[in-house]
Regions:
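ABC-type nucleotide-binding domain
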Residues: 36, 43-211
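Cytosolic ends of transmembrane helices, especially the final helix of ABC transmembrane type-1 domains
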Residues: 1-27
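Extended non-transmembrane interhelical loops and adjacent amphipathic helices
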Residues: 18-29, 49-53, 166
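Two-component histidine kinase transmitter core
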Residues: 30-31, 109
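Signal-transduction coiled-coil helices of two-component systems
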Residues: 14, 31-35
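Conserved E/DxxT/N motif and adjacent residues on the DHp alpha2 helix
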Residues: 26, 33, 154
Length: 211
């Protein structure tokens, strides 16, 4: 390239970078809709009992959501009790409110009516940090970084020991698979976990939660 072409290309790159930075700054400067209430206390988990009581919710101001775009409730006076240690499955058609039900527990949204509690504590009365620290979330579309299996498991806890990583993998029932690999926990997973199957990626994500 000639010096003039280099200058033109640099100016174009600079403009794109500035535009991207402005968009990022707008996102970072946006105050979250969900805030801790005055006097919020830390969540104290004793047994892990979860209670949805007469819960209502609708996406009144959301253009694209899981149903309820026209203001009709996605969740309409729902009661649900989950006992400590109990495993449940929410089954239903697309747009039926399954993902929304899960999103209300860590307060990604607030209920319009009713209440959700953990061990008798309304989730709106506790700090978001303590609430979300107590909840593990594994989404359908798992994102893995182009690093080792061990690094991906320890993503949320960079200082984790090899023993802690191995224990998390054991609890996620993926330890036998990892140990069968020639490089074990040092195996590179590829971009977005391309070298692992969908189920294996899910279990790595579950191990993250346990860690």
């Amino acid at each position: 390239c000639t010096p003039l072409e280099t200058l033109v290309n640099s100016a174009e790159t600079y403009q794109k970078a500035i535009a991207g930075f402005k968009r990022m700054d707008e996102v970072l400067s946006t105050a979250p809709d969900i805030q801790d209430k005055p006097g919020a206390v830390d969540l104290r988990v004793t047994t892990g009992a979860v209670e949805y009581r007469d819960v209502c919710f609708s996406y009144e101001d959301v253009e694209l959501g899981e149903g309820g775009v026209d203001g009709r409730p996605v969740i309409d006076h729902m009661d649900l009790s989950i006992k400590p240690g109990q495993t449940i499955a929410l089954v239903g058609p697309s747009g039926g409110g399954k993902s929304t039900t899960c999103s209300l527990l860590p307060r990604f949204y607030d209920v319009a009516d009713g209440s959700i509690s953990i061990d008798g504590q309304d989730v709106r009365d506790v700090t978001q940090q303590s609430l979300r620290r107590a909840i593990g979330l594994v989404q359908q579309d798992v994102y893995l970084f182009d690093g080792t299996i061990g690094e991906n498991i320890a993503y949320g806890k960079p200082g984790a020991t090899a023993g802690e990583i191995a224990e998390a993998a054991r609890r996620a029932n993926i330890d036998a698979f990892i140990e069968s690999l020639p490089q074990g926990y040092d195996t590179i997973v590829g971009e977005r976990g391309s070298r692992l199957s969908g189920g294996q990626k899910q279990r790595v994500a579950i191990a993250r939660v346990f860690l």
